[in-house]
């Protein structure tokens, strides 16, 4: 219903409306539409494509290092099951926290698969001979910083604290470790070119109040059914919720369908979700996720989706696996 209604509406919506405001392009897990996600190679390719920010998701290792992986699990993006079959937990998963950095270095990072071993995006990277490996946050920061220096560029960091409550239960304060790392690179001030993001509202509050982080924070918004954290996202997706978020965060990262009023959509109308105006009024940056050229809603084009995001939704940017089509749209439409 969402995709069919959205298609009909988008076809009748004028997509080219010039605006002076910037539209941030965030490289989701690096150039993950072209190379295995979160590898240094994916970050390098993303840099070459010149987004505004490159994302790093962060999890902890057994020996206290921070590595860049989207999940606390390893089995869907590496060959860990073949190399360490006896390190599986009772739930059938392999966890980064159970491995030292040296052990993680022996793994080959591959294109993402589901838990049955089927590649999630069938037409993405098929190679097996190039050796992609797990990298640390320090390595990602150094790489992007050096490329910025050499090319006189200013691409920012967009770093996510993954599963802080789970890490805490395992005895790891991942947020403090992240802030310690950022401080070493002077990425902890209010003017630093970085967003720290998290799905856990309690941890966002802790970052600001208890840990004293002065930089920009984004609260990611999930659907309650996903079990992403103990946060009640439905309560936050209201005018009052946006006001509460604005007390601690500088921005929000909603799931794309959350941007539209579903009741209006069922009537064939495109109406921004009621909380969206409040978020803008509160000064929250709005960076929804995730635009994928190879996972568009049925029957819709990239131009239609991006047109909705830039006008009439008028969000501040988007997370994307593929930077070039977003840049091309912005160039052609004068955004």
Listing of model-derived features with the role each one plays in the protein:
Residues 1-21:
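Gram-negative bacterial Sec-dependent N-terminal signal peptides
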Residues 13, 21-335:
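Phosphate-group recognition and catalysis centered on beta-loop-alpha active-site segments
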């Amino acid at each position: 219903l969402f995709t069919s209604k959205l298609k009909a509406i988008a076809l009748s919506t004028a997509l080219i409306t010039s605006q002076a405001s910037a539209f941030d392009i965030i490289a989701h897990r690096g150039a993950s539409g072209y190379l295995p996600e979160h590898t240094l190679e994916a970050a390098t390719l993303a840099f070459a494509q010149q987004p505004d920010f490159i994302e790093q998701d962060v999890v902890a290792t057994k020996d206290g290092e921070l590595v860049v992986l989207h999940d606390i699990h390893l089995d869907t993006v590496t060959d860990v099951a073949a190399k360490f079959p006896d390190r599986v937990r009772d739930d059938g998963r392999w966890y980064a926290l159970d491995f030292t950095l040296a052990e993680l270095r022996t793994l080959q990072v591959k294109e993402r698969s589901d838990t049955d071993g089927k590649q999630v995006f069938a037409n993405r990277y098929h190679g097996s001979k190039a050796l992609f490996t797990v990298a640390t946050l320090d390595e990602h920061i150094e790489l992007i910083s050096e490329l910025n220096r050499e090319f006189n560029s200013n691409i920012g960091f967009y770093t996510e604290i993954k599963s802080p409550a789970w890490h805490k239960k395992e005895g790891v304060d991942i947020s403090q470790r992240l802030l310690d790392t950022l401080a070493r690179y002077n990425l902890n001030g209010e003017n630093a070119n970085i967003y720290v993001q998290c799905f856990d509202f309690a941890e966002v509050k802790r970052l600001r109040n208890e840990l004293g982080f002065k930089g920009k924070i984004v609260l990611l918004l999930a659907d309650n059914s996903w079990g992403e954290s103990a946060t009640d996202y439905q309560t936050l997706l209201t005018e009052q919720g946006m006001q509460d978020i604005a007390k601690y965060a500088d921005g929000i990262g909603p799931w794309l369908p959350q941007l539209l009023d579903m009741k209006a959509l069922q009537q064939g109308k495109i109406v921004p979700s009621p909380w969206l105006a409040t978020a803008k009024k509160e000064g929250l940056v709005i960076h929804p996720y995730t635009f994928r050229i190879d996972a568009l809603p049925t029957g819709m084009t990239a131009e239609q989706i991006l047109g909705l995001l830039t006008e009439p939704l008028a969000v501040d940017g988007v997370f994307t696996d593929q930077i070039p089509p977003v840049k091309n749209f912005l160039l052609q439409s004068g955004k």
